[in-house]
């Protein structure tokens, strides 16, 4: 089955690579319209997925990731329209010039070809990936989690209808709809057809892909994110940022999981934090350095376990640790962070610059929430993933991350001397 999907996707990719920006945008507009026109069908499929997932004991965090509502689906359709408004990177000349030999050379952006994406209970990923791939002239082979197979099937059906309506092959966007896990292993060996693989899921999936894939893999999306409250931080705005970073949507990978507090501000800051977290329904997991100050506050507090510093909670849970100085804060982030998103709250430019330079994450913030690590927030449109590695892309992966380049030389019967 996968062999035939790969053959069809590769053939479709050649056709997509030749489309103009106008033609690609027509497809995307059609997809957005069809998503809205067939909302009831997609939501019906999603309701069946939700019912099965709840019966199977999925956590509330996972159920939130899985759920679609009319508002969320409308937002997904609007995200597709936003991709239409983005500049098409394909064909863009990156650099070049006239060489001494008389050869005029340029480096031009081109599609990667076929993108494979393996993801878990995130039905919006289906549309996000499809829209970004189509905008950049790439075909896509998608393998969603078994929790979302009905939703994914309904969504891909809509996308394929739009493709065919525009005279393009349905194979430009395909989904593996079988829940058979053996197919994941088979997909990882499809380097003959798939040019880049992106896993979006837990640490186990990323490890599997890194160890078994013969396809270049972009990993990321696991967010053990930190906020360091410097001794010069102003408490009211700091609390506002922390509430946003923890509670706005706890199931996302850019949610803060560990709070590091400078000891010189801890006596004043921790009681205020406890009050705010109690109001927000957040359970605090406190290090011995923070536990005495937090135990007397209104927030629910538990002693933190060492392994919890490596946990991506995706829930209303927050580790709290008092540190001696920035050295200890940076050392903690280096040991337990996932190079996703980390922030410092400070009023000292010197401290801000040091944190920026020494914390090696894909996104580093000064006096801002970690929740901004998102393609839409960065002005990239929808994102295909957040990469926490350094090759070939880093941070939210927008359109440019789905392209490569080729060197083109223009001569006038030019030969090498």
UniProtKB/Swiss-Prot annotation:
Gene Ontology biological-process entries: L-proline biosynthetic process
Alphabetical list of PANTHER family matching this protein: DELTA-1-PYRROLINE-5-CARBOXYLATE SYNTHASE, GLUTAMATE SEMIALDEHYDE DEHYDROGENASE
Keyword Cytoplasm annotated: yes
Record protein name field: Gamma-glutamyl phosphate reductase
Family: Belongs to the gamma-glutamyl phosphate reductase family.
Any single GO CC term annotated in Swiss-Prot or TrEMBL for this entry: cytoplasm
Cross-referenced CDD domains: ALDH_F18-19_ProA-GPR (cd07079)
Pfam families recorded: Aldedh (PF00171)
Reaction catalysis annotation: L-glutamate 5-semialdehyde + phosphate + NADP(+) = L-glutamyl 5-phosphate + NADPH + H(+)
Protein function: Catalyzes the NADPH-dependent reduction of L-glutamate 5-phosphate into L-glutamate 5-semialdehyde and phosphate. The product spontaneously undergoes cyclization to form 1-pyrroline-5-carboxylate.
Keywords: Amino-acid biosynthesis, Cytoplasm, NADP, Oxidoreductase, Proline biosynthesis
Signal peptide: none
Pathway involvement of the protein, from the record: Amino-acid biosynthesis; L-proline biosynthesis; L-glutamate 5-semialdehyde from L-glutamate: step 2/2
Enzyme Commission number: 1.2.1.41
Keyword Magnesium: no
HAMAP family attached to this UniProt entry: ProA (MF_00412)
Intracellular or extracellular location(s): Cytoplasm
A GO molecular-function annotation: NADP binding
EC class (word): oxidoreductase
């Amino acid at each position: 089955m996968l062999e035939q999907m790969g053959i069809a996707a590769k053939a479709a990719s050649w056709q997509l690579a030749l489309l103009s920006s106008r033609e690609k945008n027509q497809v995307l507009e059609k997809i957005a319209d069809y998503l809205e026109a067939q909302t009831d069908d997609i939501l019906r499929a999603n309701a069946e997925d939700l019912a099965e997932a709840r019966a199977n004991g999925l956590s509330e965090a996972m159920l939130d990731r899985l759920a679609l509502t009319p508002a969320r689906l409308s937002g997904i359709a609007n995200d597709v329209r936003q991709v239409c408004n983005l500049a098409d990177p394909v064909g863009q000349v990156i650099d070049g010039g006239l060489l001494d030999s008389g050869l005029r050379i340029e480096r031009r952006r081109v599609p990667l070809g076929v993108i494979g994406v393996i993801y878990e209970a995130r039905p919006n990923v289906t549309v996000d990936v499809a829209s970004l791939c189509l905008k950049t002239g790439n075909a896509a082979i998608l393998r969603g989690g078994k929790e979302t197979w009905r939703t994914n099937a309904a969504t891909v059906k809509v996308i394929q209808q739009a493709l065919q309506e525009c005279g393009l092959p349905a194979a430009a966007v395909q989904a593996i709809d079988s829940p058979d896990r053996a197919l994941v292993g088979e997909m990882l060996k499809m380097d003959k057809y798939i040019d880049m693989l992106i896993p979006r899921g837990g640490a186990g999936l990323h490890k599997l892909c890194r160890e078994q894939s013969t396809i270049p893999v972009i990993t990321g999306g696991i967010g053990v994110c930190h906020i360091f409250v410097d001794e010069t931080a102003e408490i009211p705005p700091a609390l506002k940022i922390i509430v946003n970073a923890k509670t706005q949507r706890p199931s996302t990978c850019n949610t803060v999981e560990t709070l590091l507090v400078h000891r010189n501000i801890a006596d004043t800051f921790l009681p205020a934090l406890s009050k705010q977290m109690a109001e927000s329904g957040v359970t605090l997991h406190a290090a011995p350095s923070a536990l005495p100050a937090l135990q007397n506050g209104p927030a629910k507090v538990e002693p933190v376990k060492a392994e919890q510093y490596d946990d991506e909670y995706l829930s209303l849970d927050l580790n709290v640790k008092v540190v001696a100085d920035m050295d200890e804060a940076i050392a903690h982030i280096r040991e337990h962070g996932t190079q996703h998103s980390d922030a410092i709250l400070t009023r000292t430019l010197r401290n801000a610059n040091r944190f920026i330079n020494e914390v090696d994450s894909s996104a580093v913030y000064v006096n801002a929430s970690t929740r901004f690590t998102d393609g839409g927030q960065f002005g990239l449109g929808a994102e295909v993933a957040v990469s926490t590695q350094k090759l070939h892309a880093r941070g939210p992966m927008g359109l440019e991350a789905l392209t490569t380049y080729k060197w083109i030389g223009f001569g006038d019967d030019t030969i090498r001397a």
